[in-house]
Amino acid sequence: MTTFTDTEKVFLELYKAGVWGEIAHKDVLVGKHIDWKAVLGMAGKQAVVGNVSDGISLLRETEMPQPLKMKLITYVLTVRKNNETMNAAIPEIYRLLEDIGVVPVLLKGQGVAQNYRAPLSRQSGDVDLYIPDTQQIAEAYKLCQQNMKMIEPLTTDTMEAVFQYRHVVVELHGRINAYVNKTLERRFPAWCDAMFREEKERKVCIGGGFAVLPSLRLDLVFVFVHLTRHYFGGGIGLRQIADWMRLLYAHHADIDQEQLMRDVTYLGIEKIWKVFAAMAVDFLGYPKDKMPLYNERYADMGKQVLRYVLDSGNFGYHDVRTKSKSKNYYVRRCKAFTGNMSKILRNFFMFPHETIYNIPGYLKSGIKRTRF
């Protein structure tokens, strides 16, 4: 039976309050000793400190120790500052690329942040720019080499390169990878290309300039595919789930639900969507009437997925099954291997196809990272 501790319940209530702007349930917060250090620790592991802080701000009063309050304030100010830095950099990057006739598509990140109640509270990551044209990405790569610090060179197999621009990590993508299951891997590239040809991209204001986002139809699928790819590949935090929920919520009136149903079915991710939809509605506060493809039959699976998310943390970095205090390198690698295999296999009874599909990739990646 899947259960949550009292501290986890408090954390989830504050997370929901921050994401949706609703006061947390008093029966969870009132009359109980709250381990604020543990709550904020969970928020850090899930990369949602800003959201939880927003939730705490809605409380009339808290008994949080003053040192923790100061630590929280400092962290939140850093999150906001990082967002402001990234928002200022994006228009500059667009202007650089526009000078050579390249207009990239901004994926995830600061684009989905626009859907939040408080965009600056979202913990930022990288600037991901998609440039599908082979010649254009080569030109953009050359320009970035001249104006940015290169972290990783362009690779022909993944068509990705990584740079640093004014303390902001910038990733160029010439291809969108969708390694979740065989159906998605086979169908997504052509479907994605069709979306860029047929659907209108969106232009948004960021940092006093502009950025181009994918069409809504594509973004709804891409953001979900991205989070499920990381879920099956190692783990995700509630930040990625908040990105997806806020995207759906902000645009629910414009979503063609029948078209979305056809898309996720064609791409082989219908069941995964329904499980995550049940998790969002039944445990994370998403309004039931605004969730596409919600089915209460998947509530137990949704609860189990939430349990896994809490156990693993952002990108799976905080899962204790992968950690070892041994000074021996090979003992640590063995612990990481068995722990990560356990994380992958835990999904087998819910998602057998995705579990089996992801094992070879994990083994290949693990061998590549191991020193012999």
What are these regions (language model features)?
Residues 1-125, 131-372:
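Conserved NTP-donor binding/palm subdomain of two-metal-ion nucleotidyltransferases/polymerases, i.e.
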